[in-house]
A protein has these predicted regions:
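Juxta-kinase regulatory segment immediately upstream of eukaryotic protein kinase catalytic domains
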Residues: 1-16, 22-23
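Conserved N-lobe loop of protein kinases adjacent to the ATP-binding glycine-rich P-loop
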Residues: 27, 37-45
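Conserved N-lobe ATP-binding subsite of Hanks-type protein kinase domains
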Residues: 32
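The N-lobe alphaC helix and its flanking beta3-alphaC-beta4 segment of protein kinase-like domains
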Residues: 43, 49-76
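Short beta-strand micro-motifs within the conserved protein kinase catalytic domain, predominantly
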Residues: 77-88, 96
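Structural motif in protein kinase domains
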Residues: 95-105
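Activation segment signature within eukaryotic-like protein kinase domains
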Residues: 118-119
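Protein kinase catalytic-loop region centered on the HRD/HxD motif
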Residues: 124-134
Length: 134
């Protein structure tokens, strides 16, 4: 997700009358990912955002994939994909930890069990990418 998205424009702003971004989780080549909240029920959510001007709307593709995979093991719940101001926005379940969090917590070391769990999850991800991008 890309640095084109200015975090200051996003933080504490209300989107779709109920979702507010509270803090940056991370960013990639297409946009940014925020921890947020649904102010109607106080549920913490994940808030992904990219500039509407992006050549491809990766978040729309991701939302379609999440909708198609709904209920699958390890698949976060998908709440909403929409447009607001100059942004494409994906609202989904906030998952507990990132791989980076676990790695740092374990002094930059993974056990054999954790490595095997990650390998299985990576195979799942590869399969999902194969289904949607080939």
């Amino acid at each position: 997700m890309s640095s084109e998205v200015n975090s200051e424009e996003i933080l504490n702003k209300l989107f779709f009358s109920q979702y507010k971004a509270l803090g940056l989780i991370g960013e990639g080549s297409f946009g940014k990912c925020f921890k947020g909240i649904n102010i109607k029920n106080n549920e913490e959510i994940c808030f992904k955002i990219e500039k509407k001007s992006s050549q491809k709307t990766f978040l729309k593709i991701e939302s379609q994939a999440l909708e198609n995979l709904k209920g699958g093991k390890g698949i976060p719940d998908f709440y909403l994909f929409g447009y607001s101001d100059n942004f494409n926005i994906l609202i989904m379940e906030l998952l507990d930890k990132t791989i980076e969090n676990v790695f740092e917590k374990n002094n930059h070391n993974f056990s054999i069990k954790t490595t095997c769990i990650l390998a299985i999850q990576l195979v799942r991800i590869k399969f999902i990418l194969y289904l949607f991008y080939s």
